[in-house]
Structures are given as C-alpha cells and as structure tokens.
Amino acid sequence: MLINIQVGDVLEVAANVLISTANPWLNLSGGVNGAILSAVGPTIQEELHTYLHCQGISAVPVGTVVQSEAGNLPFECILHAVAIDPFYDSSVELVRETIVAGLDLAINAGAKTISTPTLATGYGPMSIADFGTAVAPLANEPKFDEISLTIVVRSEEHRSELFEAISAARVSHRR
C-alpha cells in the first residue's frame, strides 16, 4: 500500500472512500464528524441512526466500521470507523484493527484510493505519532498492495511528526 501524507482538509481530498473517525453512538458531533454534518446536512446522521435502530442497538462495538453515503463530498462513500471506546480511550492496536477493517471494507467496495484523518487523535488519547505507528506495518500487507491511503493532517508539524513515526515504525518492523 502506498501511504501519502497531506496537509489540508480531509473533506476536500478527493478519494474513492473516506475512512472517517466515529464514536460508538455514530453521532456526527465534532471534529471531522462535525465538519461532515456541516457540509452535508442531517442526511448522513439520519442514515447512521437508522443503521443503529435497524440493528436494535444504541451504539456499535469498538472496532466497528459502518458505511454511509457521502452526500456532496468527493467520495463514493464514507466509512465511519470507531477507533475509540465509550470513554474515548484507544490504543495503537485498536487503531490498527479498525483501519484494517476499514481498508478491507473499502477494497470490497472497489476502492483504489482512500483518505483518512488520524483516527483517535482528536477526542481520543492517541498522538499523531501513535497513529503512524499503527498504520506503518499495513504498508507491507500484500492484501493492500493495490490501494493508496492518503492520511490528511491539519499542519506541517503534524505531517512531519507522522512521517517520522511511519518511517521509524517501518524500520523497527523490518527487524
């Protein structure tokens, strides 16, 4: 998998699929989710709450990825990835598992290009470097060879931090 790092607004980075951060209640309440709600209006929020209602649950388990329409955003769909628990805790392992679930779902949807913010680093406890550590080993997974992942960060400082973490994780993973 080719990993790109870009500074900007994740909602403006065109890709086949956006893997967006989500909370267990699938509420579009802040951060990237709040931006989705502002950009698209209530339709995606209604779709996510309908999903919960149809499943007979009020929240999804940690690690779940739920697909929705993308509205007027430059994606074929949005994958809402729950990489935090109900107390907004997370780990490198949980983020990696959640990203893998999202990438698998994206591939099954026919995606070749995927964009994502750094999951669990806003309201969650993870650092940008932790996210890099979680994602780096996936670059060498054969099942992801045909896709590219663009990780979108908000500053040049975050881009540098993420690049260094991914580079360091790749070196230590090869040992």
Language-model regions, residue ranges each:
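Glycine-/small-residue-enriched capping loops at alpha/beta junctions
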Residues: 1-108
